[in-house]
């Protein structure tokens, strides 16, 4: 795997795109069985269409690797917590009267298709052109229908995506709900700031944003993350988090939002597990994600 560059691109089977497919595979696993933790019936056909066989075997339960991060309980619960958090964010925003939603770096996210959006909601999705084209085409072939006003936009978030958003009819004068899920570590530090500056510029008072805070994103290149990458390689998947993320000091998202006109609330990884009725995560999962917080901001 090659290290990231400022002009790199990907599809759902390569680089950062493959991590989105891995997350979709985890959602597919968590959506199975009588005690399913999620209800994402579109994740599995997307993963199968991408065709990365290690991830197809993962959703089929045909993996023999048994280090702690691959534990079905810990992995499925972590994905369920994360997915439910952002699902609930959009549901609450819609119930509160917001009628514009923007999913940044949407990957194989299926919320435009599976959430019960209120009447009049416009849902925008932004991601790499190859990712957007693959997902919309595959789900159309599968017979899945998005919400009535679904506007996917194929553009790199390092480019002038605000102009592309406006060109598709986005109204900066109306409150908007934004999510940046599983995104920030894949942006250079300065691009993270620019992302939130653009969101702020496009957000009227009452708009909301949800994202994640990692106190030390560089921890993804530590020994435990290296063991996780080794596990993926044994599965046949050439993914190395140390090569995919951007390193270096970056502003703390909680403080940055608070300093730029947002009222911020953060809930810890452990708190959200308890909120969803799960036992505390195991030690290996805590080592990777334990310092993480789920963050919501409301524009003042």
Swiss-Prot record:
Keywords, A to Z, come to:
Methyltransferase, S-adenosyl-L-methionine, Transferase
Does this entry carry the keyword Transferase?
yes
**Do you know which Gene3D superfamilies this protein is assigned to?**
Vaccinia Virus protein VP39
This entry's Gene Ontology molecular function terms read:
methyltransferase activity
Its GO biological process terms?
A: methylation
Give the NCBIfam families listed for this entry. mthyl_TIGR00027 (TIGR00027)
Say what the protein does. Answer: Exhibits S-adenosyl-L-methionine-dependent methyltransferase activity.
Protein name as it appears in the record: Putative S-adenosyl-L-methionine-dependent methyltransferase MMAR_1058
Q: Which organism is it from?
A: Mycobacterium marinum (strain ATCC BAA-535 / M)
């Amino acid at each position: 795997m090659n290290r990231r560059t400022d002009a790199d691109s990907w599809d759902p089977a390569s680089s950062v795109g493959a991590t989105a497919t891995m997350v979709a595979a985890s959602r597919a696993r968590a959506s199975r069985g009588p005690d399913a933790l999620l209800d994402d019936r579109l994740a599995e056909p997307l993963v199968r269409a991408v065709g990365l066989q290690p991830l197809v075997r993962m959703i089929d339960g045909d993996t023999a690797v048994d280090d702690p991060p691959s534990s079905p309980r810990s992995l499925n619960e972590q994905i369920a917590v994360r997915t439910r958090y952002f699902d609930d964010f959009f549901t609450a925003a819609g119930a509160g009267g917001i009628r514009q939603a923007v999913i940044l770096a949407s990957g194989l996210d299926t919320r435009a298709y599976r959430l019960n959006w209120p009447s009049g909601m416009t849902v925008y999705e932004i991601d790499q052109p190859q990712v957007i084209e693959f997902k919309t085409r595959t789900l159309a072939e599968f017979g899945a229908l998005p919400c009535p006003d679904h506007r996917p936009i194929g553009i790199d978030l390092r480019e002038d995506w605000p102009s592309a958003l406006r060109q598709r009819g986005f109204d900066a004068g109306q409150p908007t709900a934004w999510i940046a899920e599983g995104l920030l570590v894949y942006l250079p530090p300065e691009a993270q700031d620019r992302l939130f500056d653009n969101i702020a510029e496009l957000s009227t008072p009452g708009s909301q944003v949800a994202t994640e805070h990692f106190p030390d994103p560089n921890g993804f290149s530590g020994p435990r993350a290296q063991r996780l990458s080794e596990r993926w390689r044994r599965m046949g998947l050439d993914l190395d988090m140390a090569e995919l993320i951007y390193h270096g000091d970056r502003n703390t998202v909680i403080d940055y939002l608070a300093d730029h006109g947002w009222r911020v609330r953060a809930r810890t990884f452990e708190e959200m597990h308890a909120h969803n009725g799960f036992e505390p995560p195991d030690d290996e999962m805590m080592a990777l994600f334990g310092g993480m917080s789920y963050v919501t901001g409301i524009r003042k």
